[in-house]
């Protein structure tokens, strides 16, 4: 972690002051949850060296318990790693833990957290979430994007056919990211962006910097460290590029609306049109601004693209590592649609085993392993311990999904485990929370899932997939690339042979 390279710069100057502050705060502290030993200034940060945060925190929780306190520099934090404690935070005391801490990366890219996902709890957040649920991502709107999804899936299939016909390995990761980006852009903007590659790259860059464990987040009052680390400069540069692209799109939409032209990909409203319409709604408590629109679009793009693309790649990687699962899933798709020229989202509802594959993928590889952090709004007692106001709270859903107390053979990829199991991912089962729970459950869940099922089914139907020559399933690397979301590290390169169904 980069902050260690900066410790020597400020250690001597601040040591005496912070040591005094540390002693004073400890003498006045309440009964915090147990946690690992701390040192002045850095707190518990030395324990975070040597692994991905969700891995390290899982291992620490085995020693210190399912409700664990850490001092991350200046930030008091609590990590939740059990079903019962997750229920306390996300249901019993949901409203108390409904706010968000400041994460510098998201503060910059989301226009002072004026979006939905990272906005602090309050009337503004309630208004923005209502707009999202009622106007942007309601069931009707998600269904209305089905023809865009079909069109983008056709383009995806054609691009892979082109790759395979030339004998090239298919960069499955790249193709899926492009599909998810195009799908989200056309839904939000009505078109594929001219600067889509740059836009997507910069959003992913920010997501990779938004873990909340960097120097700018753990030492928020030491502004000179923000400058020295270079982190803020990187974020601002990424933000400027994203802002310019979104600003151009909004201005183009305004011109088209003024001229009576349609912006939507299919002649109706796209998401920017909806937000521009609401900008003129005088009944809103908080008027919609250009920055609000930009922040929501960044939310949509980040969540819509990352959730569907990372989960699709993980699903295919796990099927390649577990050939029996791949064979069973592909056989189901081809048997279900063997007499059909084409199939759509309604048809995909029949694919029960494919749904189990997705659920198992989300169990082992939740899009956001620690969820988006919450912030405690007032002192709260849980399980005999006090969680002070302003404490950052992380729920390790990655660890919950791999806990042998809740899952047999927890580290193995076995979709069949869900066949006779009523556990779902809608926030009601606290051992399985890939989209969170409570009032801050991911509002774009239905949009993300809709962009998962159809493309994966079509890919299984149209191609026979194999690992590159010389790579055995057991050798496939499933190393994670850390960030606020966890993608698979490196591209997934596969052989794709077009399928020619026999017509009898």
From Swiss-Prot:
A molecular function (GO) term: iron ion binding
Superkingdom of origin organism: Eukaryota
InterPro entries: CYP450_71D, Cyt_P450, Cyt_P450_CS, Cyt_P450_E_grp-I, Cyt_P450_sf
pH dependence remark: Optimum pH is 7.5.
Cofactor(s) this protein cannot do without: heme
Binding sites annotated in the UniProt record for heme: 442
Coiled-coil parts of chain: none
Transmembrane parts of this sequence: 2-22
Subcellular locations according to the entry: Membrane
Catalyzed chemical reaction(s): (+)-5-epi-aristolochene + 2 reduced [NADPH--hemoprotein reductase] + 2 O2 = capsidiol + 2 oxidized [NADPH--hemoprotein reductase] + 2 H2O + 2 H(+)
Disulfide bonds: none
EC number: 1.14.14.149
Functional summary from the UniProt entry: Involved in the biosynthesis of capsidiol. Catalyzes the successive and independent hydroxylations at the C1 and C3 positions of 5-epiaristolochene. The second hydroxylation step is 8-fold more efficient than the first hydroxylation reaction. Capable of utilizing premnaspirodiene as a substrate.
Family: Belongs to the cytochrome P450 family.
Protein name: 5-epiaristolochene 1,3-dihydroxylase
The organism of origin for this protein: Nicotiana tabacum (Common tobacco)
